[in-house]
Regions:
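Hydrophobic beta-strand positions that form the internal "hydrophobic ladder"
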Residues: 50, 91-92, 131, 173, ...
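Eukaryotic protein-protein interaction scaffolds centered on beta-propeller repeats
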Residues: 18-40, 249-253, 290, 327-433
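Residue-level detector of Asp-centered blade-edge/turn motifs that repeat once per structural unit
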Residues: 45-46, 87-88, 126-127, 168-169, ...
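Short glycine/acidic-enriched loop and turn motifs that connect beta-strands
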Residues: 57-58, 138, 179-183, 224-228, ...
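Cysteine endopeptidase catalytic domains of the caspase/legumain-like
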Residues: 371-787
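Beta-strand-rich domains and repeat architectures in extracellular enzymes and scaffolds
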Residues: 30-57
Length: 787
């Protein structure tokens, strides 16, 4: 957002008779590692989508229900002033003298409007499909968003527009302008169709205006002549007569004047010029909430009434998406509980993270690493930052933003705030002690022997450790239970399958469920060059189940297709491709375990394993829910946890195999569909995502899943395969080699599938299906192509 400002940086320790509620959770992020600074955001009024704009001109659109970004494209704005998102897919971008309206689904510009003067204020009415901008020299222009045309242009002949608000009836608009020298000006209520002045308020310096839901009141913020006092005032929505004043503060105190806001349920939600978000009670008076969370108040830059709102309702949930600081962390405010209940971080690349006030998290691996809880008041001497990934095992929650929106007041109040100081004080801290008995300066060491030993020291809170885990080249290689001691020794086997450097990190789990910060180190292995790797390829496809009502349409064809294309495109990478083809009635637990056990005994560190499964996938229904893939002889998917335990293959089973198999390049691809008629398919899908994501991170392996979509025969008729596997086969066949270097890496493949499957499913089924890819391991090639 661009604003005209006068600099007024003042610090004061102002006390108040009654302090408002404050945001108790503190988040930070590694700004030097972000791709681009966020410069704008908006949410559709129905709460289904949110859009974010970045300094590098990228715009991304987030699907709240799906819990992921579904669109990213580049625009032409240079200095974004405001943005709005409509329910019918229009994105409105405002800067300088330009308004651009884009259909974000097609990325096409629908129209552009050019104003005479620079835009200083804008406002949007979803109810009436109207948009308006105020400009320098008092000009106002109103647009019909349905017809994409100008309705009227008129001028308040005084100065720059400083406040602008549509009346809920869509026929009138309130306009205020900045004072010229000492001359104050009234707010005018103007008829949009004619431009006629209907009524004026008393004179003042107005920086914000917002009608309540019925148009009975107009809430405004104003400054006095000497710019030393800011007030919130309630005007009659028809006569603009002053009804009452809500709040008055000296400008260098806790809260200076709002320059943007909206009224909801008797509250004014305002973004202030002190770069805070405040909630004012317009009935009882006073400030109910502020994001200013400490006694030292830094006012920052005082706006002269030029700026725009960054608070958007998320449908009828009572939650609002806000951004007062102008950085990459957005907040979710709940008006019913009067609290920040969540946070949303995003970057212009693929990264995003969602955080709830009770410590639940969701997001991409890089975002969960870059965003952290922090506290300047902790007693700890080190490890001040606790990245979100530290709570992945205990707190990962797919589609978290949707959950936060759906949680009612009772549920929200029952949630406990994540108490940063208490948690950070008890997190263990680790340090690399030695490699083969010698100290490793700066976290680096060299070794010629393949079998080596490392020691990890716990430097703080050793009694809190429940286990210490060691990862090699991002794959889990060993877990040692916590014993209260301060030193843990690991026997390791070095490899040059990724080159001479072996990358390690260790982390300690704690009693609080939060992991320590990773201690990272490298060992340069100068031993004997290893033999060319082998590929162990396990493909499982089950069309015919023992219970015929679970039969599928094309699981066998999908498994056959995957086996053929990987064998064809991967041969030159490997000394040998060792296939395990398990189909239909042969696909029982004993046979699948036998194949994986055989690989466990033979695979070396430099080898690769790919496991592909096409069949049913379910969550158990007991208290300890677990994800299962369903072999041929399971005859009841739901309500028989004993049968699943006896004949199914659980996430825990897969985790054990992934950990025990030496191969450090592991890929698991699951096209595990839901059975038709599963009433709680959405909940089951989220639970499966959580189980697989935690499995992927805990083992450091790659997982690509279809997220439990139901199979349809029409997919096979048109594609010859299911949608997910069709995209997979296209990708491995060469379509996913986006940089055209004739080598396909696993990250390139997963990105292609995540983008292609929604496109295909919307074309064939009318609704988008979103696969999930969890890539916590190192990237590596899976196929090569001849020129």
């Amino acid at each position: 957002m661009r604003i005209l400002t006068v600099v007024l940086v003042l610090i004061s320790l102002v006390s108040q008779a009654q302090e408002p509620e404050v945001d108790k959770v503190r988040l930070g992020y590694l700004k030097n590692e972000t791709t681009s600074e966020q410069v704008g955001m908006a949410a559709s009024p129905d709460g289904t989508h949110a859009a974010f704009a970045f300094r590098d001109r990228t715009v991304k659109v987030f699907d709240v229900k799906a819990g992921r970004f579904i669109k990213r494209f580049t625009t032409s704005f240079v200095n974004l002033f405001d943005m709005q998102l409509t329910n019918d897919g229009k994105l409105i971008l405002v800067e300088g003298k330009q308004i651009e309206i884009i259909d974000w689904k097609t990325e096409k510009t629908l129209t552009q409007f050019t104003t005479t003067f620079e835009i200083t204020k804008s406002t949007y009415s979803d109810r009436n499909n109207l948009f308006a901008v105020g400009q320098r020299e008092g000009w106002v222009e109103v647009y019909d968003l349905k017809l994409l045309k100008v309705i009227n242009t008129f001028q308040y002949k005084k100065h720059h527009v400083s406040a602008l608000a549509f009346h809920p009836d869509g026929k009138k608009i309130a306009v205020a302008v900045m004072p010229l020298l000492k001359e104050m000006n009234p707010i005018r209520l103007i008829e949009i169709r004619t431009g006629n002045i209907l009524v004026e308020s008393k004179k003042g310096f107005y920086t914000m205006a917002a009608f309540d839901e019925k148009g009975e009141n107009l809430v405004v913020s104003s400054l006095n002549t000497f710019v030393t006092k800011a007030s919130i005032e309630i005007l009659n929505g028809t006569s603009l007569a002053l009804t009452r004043a809500v709040d008055g503060k000296v400008v260098w105190g806790n809260n200076i004047m709002p320059n943007a806001g909206r009224v909801s349920n008797g509250k004014l939600l305002a973004i202030t010029a002190s770069r805070s978000f405040n909630v004012y009670d317009i009935d009882a008076g006073g400030i109910r909430f502020t994001t200013k969370s400490d006694g030292i108040k830094i006012s920052g830059f005082m706006s002269l009434g030029v700026g725009n709102e960054n608070s958007f309702p998320l449908g009828n949930s009572g939650k609002f998406l806000i951004n007062s600081l102008g950085n990459n962390i957005n907040q979710i405010y709940d008006i019913k509980t009067n609290a920040i209940v969540g946070y949303f971080f995003c970057d212009s690349n693929d990264d995003f993270a969602v955080v709830s006030r009770d410590g639940r998290v969701e997001g991409t691996p890089e975002a969960l690493r870059k965003v952290f809880w922090t506290s300047i008041w902790t007693s700890r001497l080190s490890n001040q930052r606790t990245p979100l990934e530290s709570t992945f095992e205990s707190g990962f929650t797919p589609r978290l933003l949707s959950q936060i929106m759906d949680e009612d007041e009772k549920t929200q109040l029952a949630k406990t705030t994540f108490e940063v100081e208490k948690v950070i004080d008890k997190i263990p801290a680790l340090q690399l002690k030695s490699v083969n008995g010698a100290a490793a300066a700066n976290g680096t060491a060299s070794a010629t022997q393949k079998q080596s030993k490392v020691e990890i020291a716990v430097t703080q809170n050793a009694q809190e450790v429940t286990e210490v885990k060691l990862y090699q080249n991002s794959k889990l290689v060993k877990v040692i239970p916590g014993n209260g001691k301060s030193l843990y020794g690991f026997d390791i086997s070095l490899t040059n399958s990724f080159g001479e450097l072996n990358y390690f990190y260790a982390t300690a789990s704690s009693k609080s469920g939060v992991e320590s910060e990773k201690v990272k180190f490298t060992i340069n292995y100068k031993g004997v060059t290893e033999a060319k790797p082998k590929l162990y390829l396990v493909t499982i496809g089950i069309d015919k189940y023992k219970n015929p009502k679970y039969n599928l349409n094309y699981a066998q064809a999908d498994a056959d297709g995957v086996a053929n294309v990987i064998n064809k495109q991967s041969k030159s990478l490997f000394q040998e491709v060792v296939p395990f083809s398990i189909r239909n009635d042969k696909a029982i637990k004993a046979n699948i375990f036998a194949a994986l056990n055989q690989i466990k005994t033979k695979a070396l560190e430099q080898d690769m394993i790919v496991v592909y499964y096409a069949g049913h996938g379910v969550m158990s229904s007991g208290a300890e829910k677990e994800f299962y893939i369903v072999p041929h002889d399971v005859t009841q998917l739901y309500g028989r946890d004993d049968m699943l335990a006896a004949k199914g293959i659980s996430a825990s089973d897969l985790r054990n195999f992934a950990s025990d198999i030496n191969a450090q390049k592991q890929v698991f691809i699951l096209d595990a569909c839901q059975s038709a008629g599963a009433l709680d398919a959405l909940d089951r899908g989220a639970a499966e995502e959580k189980a697989i994501a935690q499995l992927a991170r805990s083992t450091g392996t790659f997982w690509i899943t279809s997220t439990g979509a139901e199979q349809f025969a029409t997919e096979f008729a048109k594609l010859g395969h299911g949608i997910f596997t069709y995209a997979l086969l296209e990708g491995i066949g060469g379509a996913a080699d986006t940089n055209k270097d004739q080598r396909l890496t696993i990250r390139e493949l997963s990105t292609y599938i995540e983008n292609k499957v929604p496109e295909l499913s919307e074309q064939l089924k009318g609704t988008a299906q979103f696969p999930s890819a969890y890539s916590f391991g190192n990237d590596f090639p899976i196929a090569v192509f001849e020129k």
